[in-house]
Structure formats: C-alpha cells, structure tokens
Amino acid sequence: MKSLIRPLVVLFVILTAVTGLAYPAVMTVFGQAVFPSQANGSLIEQDGKVVGSALIGQPFDAPKYFWGRLSATAPMPYNAAGSGGSNFGPLNPSLPDQVKARIAALRDAGTDLSKPVPVDLVTASASGLDPEITPAAAAYQVERVAKARHLAPDAVAQLVAANTTGRQFGVLGEPRVNVLKLNLALDAAQAAH
C-alpha cells in the first residue's frame, strides 16, 4: 500500500505544478507578449483614462448617442457578473409583449418608426453584454443622432461606415458596429466640427 501512495503523491505534485503553475504562467507571458491589448481586456482609452472595453457593451440612452443591444443583466445593465441568456423563446407568449414594449420605448425616445425596427434594437443578446450592433441597427439610428447633434445625416452615416467591421477572415460572422467606438468617434468629430 505504501508503495502506491508515494507515486500518487509525486504525480499529484507534478501535475499541480504543470497545470496549476507552469501552464498558466507560460500562457500569461505569451498573451502579454503577443496580444497585449486583448490579454488586458481590449480596453479603450481616451485622454489617458479607460472609458470602456471593446468587448463589453455600455449603457447609452442620450439621444445624441447610438444605442446598443439591450442589456439582460438587470438590475445593473452590462454587468459581466450577471451575464446569461435572457430572451424568451419564440413560442413564449410573453415575447411579443416584451418586443412591443421595447418598440414603444423607441417611439417615446423620438425614433421614427415608419421603417422596420432592426431586431437587435428590441432583443437582448445571449450574454446580455454585446458591445456591437448590426449596420442596419446603426443606420436606423442615424437620423435621431444627427438631429440631436445638429450634424448632417450623411456625416453621421459616414462615421457609421468607417466604424463598421466586416466578417472575420471574410467569412465568419456578420458585419458589425462597435457602439462605444462609434460614439467616441462621434464625440471626436463633433469636437473637431
């Protein structure tokens, strides 16, 4: 029996050192050396201060800003600790009522509802933390943002186009617009205007 315990303890110590210490240390050094921005959370700085992350959505509700997908992390919006699925299923009888309420909130905010509302403006994402919207959702908001900022809609649409990211490697995912980056670009453009 004693002859079995010693090899087990040695194996335990070796595996703990390799998987618990060496591997995480090597991956941390590799990440910091090769992907420093991503390894540190893809933080976005403005004037030397961190204003957010390109990976986590932020609440924007002023008419002069583009709005992202709804957060599903109540009661604190965009709380990464509360991330998780939140949308009702397509057969849930509460889904139409929830979507109608969100459309009414858009109307109350002065949004022109004569065009179809992009689905990502009235539903939350799977995580409830999405930092990006579709180009259609951004285009839908151009008039409201331009009016609130006293800018030409074409100038705002150009900023949307400049902040639209295509499919990864040309085939993965869909084109998307990072709301935080777009709103920072809007602030910079208006300050320069």
From Swiss-Prot:
Cell location: Cell inner membrane
Entry keyword annotation includes Cell inner membrane: yes
Pfam families referenced in this protein's UniProt entry, alphabetically: KdpC
Keywords linked to the UniProt accession: ATP-binding, Cell inner membrane, Cell membrane, Ion transport, Membrane, Nucleotide-binding, Potassium, Potassium transport, Transmembrane, Transmembrane helix, Transport
Family annotation (InterPro entries): KdpC
Chief location category: membrane
NCBIfam families in UniProt: kdpC, PRK00315.1
Transmembrane residue ranges: 7-27
Keyword Nucleotidyltransferase annotated: no
Example of a GO cellular component annotation carried by this entry: plasma membrane
Subunit structure, as described in the record: The system is composed of three essential subunits: KdpA, KdpB and KdpC.
Family per similarity comment: Belongs to the KdpC family.
GO molecular function: ATP binding; P-type potassium transmembrane transporter activity
Protein name as annotated: Potassium-transporting ATPase KdpC subunit
Database matches in HAMAP family: KdpC (MF_00276)
Role played: Part of the high-affinity ATP-driven potassium transport (or Kdp) system, which catalyzes the hydrolysis of ATP coupled with the electrogenic transport of potassium into the cytoplasm. This subunit acts as a catalytic chaperone that increases the ATP-binding affinity of the ATP-hydrolyzing subunit KdpB by the formation of a transient KdpB/KdpC/ATP ternary complex.
Membrane topology reported for the UniProt record: Single-pass membrane protein
